């Protein structure tokens, strides 16, 4: 369920709130191949299903940075900040990839809005995010995201 706020004052009131979980999305071989083409990372563990099946993970796996890049579309399912002119990614802290995402797996984001602080012309949010793998015992990614919203 999406939490919608209008303006920075309403956003500030959400500090410390759990934002819940996104819907599950499937990580397909096509998505992995497209990411490989975009980044030039064609390592066999990602793009060669036959070799990867015999490799350490038993199947192709998503690039860690592909998993990380999915934070944004998953996060937009959780928080919609309206009444601002600009929304930008500011950075990341503490990114880890505890478990690989095998092709065909489904992932989702669980997020908490840790902090909202004033910055010149707007506000910066700090979000703790965990990208879970359906049926997995360890998350695919654990991160802290920084975003800015300008009035």
Map each language-model feature to its residues:
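Internal, well-ordered alpha-helical scaffold/interface segments
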Residues: 33, 69-73
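A generic structural signal for short beta-strands and their flanking turns/coil linkers
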Residues: 21-23, 31, 41, 84-93, ...
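Generic structural detector for well-ordered beta-strands
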Residues: 24-26, 96, 146-148
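Catalytic strand-loop segment that frames the active site of acyl-thioester-processing enzymes
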Residues: 2-62
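A solvent-exposed, acidic/Ser-Thr-rich amphipathic alpha-helical stretch
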Residues: 65-67
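Hydrophobic beta-strand-centered segment that forms part of the acyl-chain substrate-binding groove
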Residues: 55-59, 72-110
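HotDog/MaoC-like acyl-thioester-processing domains
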Residues: 1-14, 100-151
